[in-house]
Amino acid sequence: MIPTTLTSAGRTSSRVTSSSVSFVSRGFRGRRRDTEGDLTRVPPGQHVTEDFPVLSAGPTPHTPLDEWTFSIVNGDERETWTWDEFRALPSETVTVDIHCVTRWSKLDTTWEGVSIDTLLEQVEHEAAYVLAFCDGGYTTNLPLEDVSDGKAWVAFAYDGEPLDPEHGGPARLLVPHLYFWKSAKWVRGLMLRDTDEPGFWETYGYHSYGDPWREQRYAGD
């Protein structure tokens, strides 16, 4: 079991090319990377912000908690939790740095959530990848090893408060070592897969993995 409070510098990256995709972005006030005292925490090409910018490709979903569920889908099998069942699971508080592909980084962010390890304990599988699926039809792909062994959570609180819908509430994926688009907002489950399948942004040219320290913003980076 990992400690209840963690600190991570995180690592990741990504890209998009279609003019048909619209963005909603606000709240950015940044400082250049070269003004930071501890450069080891800020990946190349990133600026530190004290705000929490909002970036979405569509409308913000507002799912009532009594209608919310989270599922692990493994072929024809599905393990599902209601909101109350999910909140009854053991949770962890983690403090991590996050890095957006749009070049902002926010340091020392504090979240509370359920470890993906806790959820996967309920399912027998031999999967190598997961595809996160969310309200609004958004998906993103990740290697299983990047969401297990204490690397990822389904987060329901930020800075001690319930997670706002604009930041992915009631629950979002938190995978801080990868670019933040991999921490999918409004997450509703994980599909376990033997092969890697591109998600939403990945089909528009973003990198399949997204390591910010290697600046993997776009396919081919």
Regions found by a protein language model. Name each.
Residues 2-8:
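Alpha-helix boundary/capping motif
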Residues 22-221:
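Structured, non-membrane catalytic/scaffold regions adjacent to prosthetic-group chemistry
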